[in-house]
Amino acid sequence: MKYKQLIESLGNEYFFYSHNINGDYLYISPSVKTILGYEVEEAKLGLVKHMTDSELNKKTIEVLKKSATGEKQKTFQFELFTKSGSIKVIEITESPLYNEKGELISIEGVAHDITRRIEREKTIKEQNEKLKQQTEELEATIADLKQTQSQLVQSEKMRALGNLIAGVAHEINTPIGAINASIDNISRSLDDILANIYTLFTQISEQQLLAFLTLLKMIRRDKPPLISKEKRYYKKLVKEKLDNAGFEDTYTITDHLIYLNLYEDADQVIPILQIEDPVFILKSLHNIYSVRKNSENIKMAVEKASKVVYALKRFTHKDQGMAKELSNLKENIDMVLTLHHNRIKQGIEVVQNYDDNIPLINCYPDELVQVWTNLISNAIQAMDNTGQLTITIRNLQERIQVSIADTGCGIPEEIHEKIFEPFFTTKKAGEGTGIGLELVLKIIEKHQGNLEFESKVGEGTTFTITLPVN
Amino acid sequence: MKKKAIVCVDDESIILDSLGEQIKNIFGDEYLYESAENAEEGLEVIEELTKEEIDVLVIVSDWLMPGKKGDEFLIEVHKKFPRIIKVMLTGQADEVAINNAIKNAELHAYISKPWSSEDLERVIKTGLSKIENKG
């Protein structure tokens, strides 16, 4: 019992015992009472009978049997009922004791109450489990959020696109309508020529033929088309001259002369028209010239439609590789203006202050289109479709500065800090997702650019973006 | 006999030119054709023609134009010239605007772009017969 005193001083957690080869206890230290609640004498009657029937103890009994034969065992654990009925986990270290002859005389053991340690370990394990579960939940939530975010970005794009489509429908239906009508006009003119060709070739007088050929040569193809106001001015002027010259049906003759771009040549034309049935000659010329006039109209309509389609194609163009490319910022911005043309023309004056020497910049052009789309669309909305939209592009050598200024309602001071927050919107439900400006900021950051704005309520807002050239 | 006129209002010259020629082709020299590029000019034209004792019978107006929209324009026309037949011709159907024009301008018909000459002819002819029936 070398360390008896030492061990007894550790009474709160340890007790010490020894038993002979028959299992009779020779000694149990008094701290057994502190730990298990049994008096020393009571404990000496045997601790094994207080063991619970746990799986752990079944193994422990095997270890105890081996230990009792003098075979040195590693530290082992078992569970015991205390006197009060609670369960304690005891860790045992036993060692055999031999006499000089080498005979086993007793087994000495140190019992360590590790109940609290086990409980702590259990708690830690449980907490670890919980943490692991929470981490998994968080990961799932993040994945969900990412998914939601990309859906929102998508729906923001779709909303912007939806806005555009309504306008684009108008922008495309207009030239198609014009083309359709022009084709109809050409067909009718040709039908009319064919119906009258015999008369024209055989029945007209020499004078009428001369008038026909002279006027045919006079048609002013190079004259620019008149706007409606000018047309009305010339109509009055020409009609008055025709009236004074004593013509009948001056409304019809006037219309033909305007149609043939002869609106400035009335004085020369009047003597030529002093023939029998001038309307027939003019009508014939009209029908021939109609093919050219309507073809020109179709050409203009096609150009208009192509411009819209091109802009639309660029807008929805998705570059899967997502590599930066050298792009022309002016074209990039003007394309967005084309797409918003139908909204702009309702009452917005666009001022374009572009420096002449803007270099191509290395960027993601499709993403920048989204930036301009958002900012221009917001500006139009802020101005309630009436006001001045000023777009400035400055060459600052290493960087290009773009500013988009409106004369709209402005952004109240108290929400200045909020406008880039996701889901913040001042628009009515359904009009905006509240991530437009967040998207703008992200795209600018991706370009290592800079975004600032100035705003005064009632005066307007200016967004200024600088982008590196390289 | 008093001259009769059909007036078209659209901010696109390609429409005014092709539509005007088409109307002339359909209706011949019996009617004058006048055009205007916006609502303000449209009203000016109607007033001018009226002053010249020309009877404006039909007005065909676009909806989406700079300045005043088609429905507001037709309502204004209706207030000053209730007898004129009002037709809207536009590439973008705005239901609210159409209903507004039906309710407040007695809109005769709505044609969407692109239109067919048959539709245009039918709409204008039914409009004209309305006037004749009223005397």
Ranges and model annotations:
Chain B
Residues 7, 50-60:
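Active-site beta3 strand of CheY-like receiver
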Residues 8, 13-38:
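Two-component/phosphorelay signaling modules centered on CheY-like receiver
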Residues 20, 35-48, 70:
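Helix N-cap/capping motif at the beta->alpha junctions
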Residues 44, 71-83:
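Short amphipathic alpha-helix used as the core "switch/output" element in two-component signaling
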Residues 65:
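Receiver (REC) domain active-site loop signature in two-component systems and cognate sites
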Residues 72, 93-109:
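Alpha4 helix (beta4-alpha4-beta5 surface) of REC/receiver domains from two-component response regulators
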Residues 89-90:
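Hydrophobic/aromatic residues positioned on beta-strands within the core alpha/beta folds
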Residues 115-124, 128:
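C-terminal output helix
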